[in-house]
């Protein structure tokens, strides 16, 4: 079992802590997506898949190639890595494509990843908006 810090260090080595994503860093987004699936009772392999879900890049983010697949498998396991690979290759928006192209547990896992990914971005956007509104309100009071 690979510890959390080793996984985070690998993501940092790929620049995830420097790349911006939805007003935070990509690393913060990946951790947030993983945390949502964890809170929802997702399995450990699904949590790992969420933590790494953009490691190969997506339609919106060209991050890395799939040349690190063996390294990623060694960190999160084959089942989680397969989900990461499929997720990264699935064009956005994903939900309908996942429902059409996959069945069974893979479909359930991909839909859970997609939902957590979208929810994390929504939560981050709401926090940023509330922070901005709070600052505007404070300025108005002063």
Model-flagged regions — what are they?
Residues 1-142:
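Metal-dependent phosphohydrolase cores
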